[in-house]
Amino acid sequence: MDKTINPWRKDFPLLQNDPVMYLDNAATAQRPACVIEAVKAFYEQANANPLRGFYPLSLKATQMYEDARKTVQRFIHAPSERCVIFTRNTTEGLNLVAYSYALHHVKAGDEIVVSIMEHHSNMLPWQMVASQ
C-alpha cells in the first residue's frame, strides 16, 4: 500500500506493517502512538479515580481529567468546558443523547435519518425514540 495515501497511518502502531483498512471504529477505534503513550503515562504516574477523593493521587487524576475537558472544549470550540461530557463509549453517548434529549424534543412528523449501515448502537436508540 502506498504510504503517501494517508500520511497519518504512521501515527498508528497497528497499521505500520499491515495493509489493513480498519473501519470498525464504532466498536473499537485504533489509537495513535501519542494516545497510547499518554494512557501509559497516566497508569504509571496518576492512576486513581478522578472526582472521587481528596488524597493527592486522586486530586492529580482529577486535575488531568479536567485539563482534558478544557483541551476538548478548545479543540471543538465549545463555549465552555461545561459543554464537554465524557462517556465510557459511543454506545453510552448515543443513548444519552437519544434518551435524555431526543426523546423529549423529537415530535410526531419529525424525521430521524440514519444509514442502513449504522452499527446497532446508533440504530436502536433512534428506533426507540421514533417509536415513542
Name each region found by the language model.
Residues 1-132:
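Pyridoxal 5′-phosphate
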